[in-house]
């Protein structure tokens, strides 16, 4: 490739539902979102851009549903879920106690913002 590099990456997504799953919109196999930059990594070095989680919660989660993030880090999916008009519940799992504290603080901020509006 004459000194050029090619990188191909993907992330797995499991969609679980009770009964028949009926999406509100088609989920494409590629989601185009901005890449993470330094502004997206304010809370955690592996923090992801918020655009993809917001999109996924919007099209996949029913009103009052449940969003589970088994490797939640600083809770980007949790912030997206709690900020959504769908009002889903959120369960996040994280092993690192320091990162759990960061996630809890971010989720509390979203809760405070929602309560103020």
Regions found by a protein language model. Name each.
Residues 103-104:
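Conserved SAM-binding loop
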């Amino acid at each position: 490739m004459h000194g050029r590099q090619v990188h191909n990456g993907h992330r797995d997504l499991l969609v679980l539902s009770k009964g028949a799953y009926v999406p509100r919109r088609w989920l494409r196999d590629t989601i185009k979102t901005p890449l993470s930059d330094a502004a997206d990594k304010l809370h955690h070095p592996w923090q992801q851009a918020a655009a993809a989680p917001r999109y996924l919660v919007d099209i996949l989660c029913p009103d009052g549903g449940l969003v589970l993030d088994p490797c939640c880090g600083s809770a980007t999916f949790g912030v997206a879920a709690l900020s959504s008009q769908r009002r889903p519940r959120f369960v996040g799992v994280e092993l690192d106690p320091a990162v759990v504290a960061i996630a809890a603080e971010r989720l509390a901020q979203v809760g405070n913002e929602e309560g103020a509006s």
